[in-house]
């Protein structure tokens, strides 16, 4: 079992501090914020192992966290401003567990996790938790051949000031060593059933955008 603590400072970049507006697209401008302050970040972590079971827990507290999102551009309703702001306080918690075992040629690892941020911004709460689960399978075949099949799931959740959509994905890979391990042949398929999407629903004040 191990317990860790980390303190760090995240400073805004010159581009984020620059008091100017730059063109991104017909509907998005990037706007600097010279009033940004450095963020102070405290992290606490715990890792414990019980045989083949591994458990992890993390907590984070931050003052003046730097967060980039979309906001209405003053006097132009049809244009969004991509801007970095300071959140006065930011807190998050996460817990996870992983268990791996071997059954003949099959070597699966099952993982599950929970994470939640706690953000209040302009009267709204952005604290919908994220649940993740995965089953990572490896099958060892003769003649240095390996088959991998990973099944991944994540729930609808808040990510900063955004809503991340529910996701499900299956990835497969076949790997074979050739010429006495001098060469390696890999055949892989990502998102086998075409179910994955990285779309986010961005909601800041009165702005809703894909």
Positions of predicted regions on the chain:
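Outer-membrane beta-barrel translocator domains and adjoining extracellular loop/strand segments
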Residues: 13-22, 26-30, 61, 65-74, ...
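C-terminal beta-signal and adjacent terminal beta-strands/loops
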Residues: 178-210
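Outer-membrane beta-barrel signature, preferentially recognizing the C-terminal barrel domain
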Residues: 9-63, 82-93
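Membrane-spanning beta-strand positions in outer-membrane beta-barrel proteins
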Residues: 2-4, 54-56, 107-109, 146, ...
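Gram-negative outer-membrane beta-barrel transporters
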Residues: 61-63, 79-82, 86-152
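Transmembrane beta-strands of outer-membrane beta-barrel pores
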Residues: 5-11, 21, 50-52, 59-65, ...
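Residues on the lipid-exposed face of transmembrane beta-strands in outer-membrane beta-barrel proteins
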Residues: 1, 5, 44-50, 95-101, ...
């Amino acid at each position: 079992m191990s317990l860790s603590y980390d303190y760090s400072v995240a400073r805004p970049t010159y581009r984020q501090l620059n008091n100017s507006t730059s063109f991104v697209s017909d509907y998005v401008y990037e706007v600097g914020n010279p009033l940004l302050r450095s963020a102070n970040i405290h992290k606490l972590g715990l890792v414990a192992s019980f045989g083949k079971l591994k458990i992890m827990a993390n907590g984070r507290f931050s003052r003046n966290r730097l967060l980039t999102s979309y906001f209405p551009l003053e006097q132009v309703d049809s244009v969004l401003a991509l801007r970095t702001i300071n959140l006065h306080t930011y807190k998050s918690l996460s817990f996870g567990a992983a268990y791996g075992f071997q059954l003949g040629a099959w070597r699966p690892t099952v993982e599950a996790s929970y994470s939640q941020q706690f953000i209040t911004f302009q009267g709204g709460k952005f604290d919908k938790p994220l649940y993740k689960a995965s089953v990572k399978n490896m099958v060892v075949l003769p003649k240095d051949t390996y088959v991998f099949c990973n099944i991944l799931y994540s729930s609808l959740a808040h990510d900063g000031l955004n809503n991340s959509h529910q996701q499900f994905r299956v990835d497969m890979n076949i790997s074979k060593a050739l010429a006495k391990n001098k060469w390696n042949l890999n055949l892989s398929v990502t998102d086998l059933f075409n179910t994955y999407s990285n779309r986010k629903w961005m909601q800041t004040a009165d702005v809703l955008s894909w």
